[in-house]
Each structure stands twice: as C-alpha cells, then as structure tokens.
C-alpha cells in the first residue's frame, strides 16, 4: 500500500496542473498561478514521501515526469501564450507570434527526458529544472501588473519572446545547478543553499510574486559562481 502513496501525490500534481491550464485559457491567470504553486508543493511532497517510505519505482519516476510535463511544461507555455497574445493584440502586432510560447513545453520535454536518463543529477541539477522555469514564467503576469514595471521594456513581446528562448536554453544547457536536497545541515557544505534560501525569503517578503524572476536569476548566478563546489 505504501508504495502507492507517492504516486497518489504525483497524480494530485497532475490534476492541479490540468485545472491550472483550464483557468489559464479562461484568462484567470491569478488562479492559474496558485494552482501551479500547489502542483509544485505536490511535486515536492511526492519525492519526500518516496524517500521517507522507501517507495521508489520505475513507474513512479515515469509518472512524475509525465505529471511534470503537464504542470511544469504545458502550463507555463499556456500562461505565456495568453500573455503574449493579449500584448500582441493590444499593440496591433501579428498574433501568431504568441505561438512561440510553446517553445517552453518542447524544451521542458527535452529537459525531463534528459533528467530521467542522466545519472549525474542525484546531488545537483544539470540545466534549469522545469519547476524553477515554471516559477519564473508564472510570475510574469504579476510582474506586468506591477505599477512600477508596467509600460516598460518588460511589456514588450520581443523581450518576453527573448526570455522564453533564453530560459528554454537554460533548461537543456550543460550547467551544474544547486539542488536543495540536503544530506546534512553543515553550514560550510551547504553555504550556497542557505544563501539561496535566505535571499529568496528576503526578496519574497519585500516584493511578493514580483521577486520570483529575481530569485531564479540569483539561483542561476549563485550556481554558476559555485560550479566547482557543486560538482565536487
């Protein structure tokens, strides 16, 4: 019985992601964001449950990737399609450019397939994880709604499409990135992880959802600076 508990939690991730996509295409992006945050929690707890119960299985691993493809692949693509389509129509630009948003699910699929077959990624990640990429893009509607940011270059479809291409590259790039899996809580061994958590908390308290892109950028920069320590 216990071996089915992680898979059940994974299925909750999948259901939450499916409902998030429905709300995205209904232009209810705030609800979409909260549902994807819920998916991320389920994604965290299914792994936690698998480790706690020693309930690992090949089916569980594949199911996790399939659920992630929906919640952290197609869902962020749907968000960016809606955002881009609205901006393109408002600025009287070709609406077909919004389809560039679906670069996200394509590269998410590549990232997940790579993760499933890469033995290096037990203690660190190689390339940006799909949940982190989803966090980045699910914050975009909040960033665009922020009064201090609206009507800046961030509101440009060209800028957002460039972000889609750049973040998709990071998902499949051969860049070692910090994993927040702790073997112990030794300060020296986990300095980068503690720094990342501390910076994230401070930024989120100050800026709320608008902080998420900055947190992901800090994550990438801190990982690149700490590359030698991560892979050692």
Residue spans for each PLM region:
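Membrane-water interface at transmembrane helix exits
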Residues: 22-26, 80-84, 113, 173, ...
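Multi-pass membrane catalytic core of lipid/isoprenoid biosynthesis enzymes
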Residues: 7-10, 52-113
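Topogenic membrane-insertion module of multi-pass membrane proteins
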Residues: 1-44, 204, 215, 226, ...
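Hydrophobic alpha-helical transmembrane segments of polytopic
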Residues: 9-12, 32-39, 100-107, 133, ...
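Alpha-helical transmembrane segments of polytopic integral membrane proteins
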Residues: 18-21, 38, 76, 106-109, ...
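Helix-coil boundary and interhelical linker segments in multi-pass alpha-helical membrane proteins
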Residues: 19-35, 74-99, 140-159, 206-210
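Interhelical loop and helix-boundary elements at the membrane-water interface
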Residues: 1-14, 51-69, 112-132, 176-191, ...
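C-terminal membrane-associated helical module and adjoining short loops/tails
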Residues: 125-232
């Amino acid at each position: 019985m216990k071996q089915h508990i992680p898979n059940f939690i994974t299925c909750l991730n999948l259901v939450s992601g499916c409902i998030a996509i429905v709300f995205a295409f209904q232009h209810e992006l705030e609800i979409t964001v909260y549902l994807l945050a819920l998916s991320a929690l389920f994604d965290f707890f299914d792994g936690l449950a698998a480790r706690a119960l020693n309930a690992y299985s090949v089916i569980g691993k594949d199911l996790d990737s399939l659920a992630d493809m929906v919640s952290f692949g197609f869902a962020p693509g749907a968000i960016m399609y809606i955002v881009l389509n609205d901006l393109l129509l408002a600025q009287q630009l070709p609406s077909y450019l919004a389809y560039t948003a679906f670069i996200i699910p394509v590269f998410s699929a590549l990232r997940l397939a790579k993760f499933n077959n890469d033995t290096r990624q037990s203690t660190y990640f190689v390339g940006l994880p799909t949940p982190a990429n989803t966090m980045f893009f699910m914050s975009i509607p909040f960033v665009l709604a922020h009064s201090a940011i609206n009507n800046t270059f961030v509101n440009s479809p060209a800028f957002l499409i460039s972000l889609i291409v750049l973040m998709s590259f990071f998902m499949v790039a051969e860049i070692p990135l910090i994993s927040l899996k702790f073997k112990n809580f030794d300060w020296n061994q986990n300095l980068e992880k503690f720094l990342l958590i501390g910076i994230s908390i401070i930024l989120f308290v100050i800026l709320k959802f608008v902080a998420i892109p900055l947190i992901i950028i800090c994550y990438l920069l801190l990982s690149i600076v700490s590359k030698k320590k991560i892979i050692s």
